Amino acid sequence: MATPSKRLLLVHAHPDDESIGQGATMAKYVAEGVGVTLVTCTGGEMGEILVPEFAHMAADQDDTLAEQRQVELSNAMEVLGVTDHRYLGGFQTYRDSGMKWHADGHAIAADDVHENAFWHADLTEAADHLVQVIREVRPQVMVTYDEFGGYGHPDHIQAHRVAMYAAQLAAVPSYKPDLGQPHDIAKIYWGAMSASKMRAGIKHLRESGEATGFEGFDESSLPPFVVEDDALTARVDARAHAEQKMAAMKAHATQITVDGPFFALSNNLGNEIWGEEFFRIAKGVACPASGSDLEDDLFAGLDC
């Protein structure tokens, strides 16, 4: 089978992060023949279980949630059409670190973190696992989190650190040649959510009386993963694939409920809210679409 000429690598912390963050973008590029590779850094062992019949899988009981989430992730990837998914270093090499909420509204490290938690991972060792993937897949574009991990989750921050460091190391010819031939990723993006889109969504929900999942957020108090529009550099219009994104999110059945805020936004605003995904460029040169301040293609400007 021929290697796709365009290749996209996404690095995420837990199963479901990919579907929430870039599910529509992934489906769009798969449909266009782009090679899409997802690397998930942990098994999601510490995720909050929202389905009562799976409660026994929690870390303080049977501790089998990772196996269930592995199945859910596989189902989500099937929905999106992604055939190349890997766990960083292999399944359960790194454990979900968990988190707790800070009074300021962002996530911070939990009081009791497992010794094998991703948050405690040796940075070079973890990066080497990803270097090997980068040198094998040879993506032109990589997507991961910003330096705050979107909202402060320790695993998101660590995924950012590992991804950015691995991208540097993978390009160095003399660095561990046993991990493959060097490869320099041309463009790196950090996923983001548009502030104007979020404000419009919350306003619409409040007016319809369905904003119960967004208490505490207003025009001046948006979730920390929301980015003001002037900081965004790319907007991928994947509205034609929004239904796939929603189906992929539903596949993560232990983590996302159909009566939660994600689906409230979808039910009220349709494909508009989840079919457009936004990014900030962290490496490379942005090439905005004609008549726009934003790129409409993550591969824009590349001679792939």
Task: Show where each model-derived region lies.
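Active-site rim/loop-helix segments in enzyme catalytic domains that contact anionic ligands
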Residues: 1-138, 169, 269, 280-283, ...
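Metal-dependent de-N-acetylase/amidase catalytic core
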Residues: 1-11, 99, 108-304
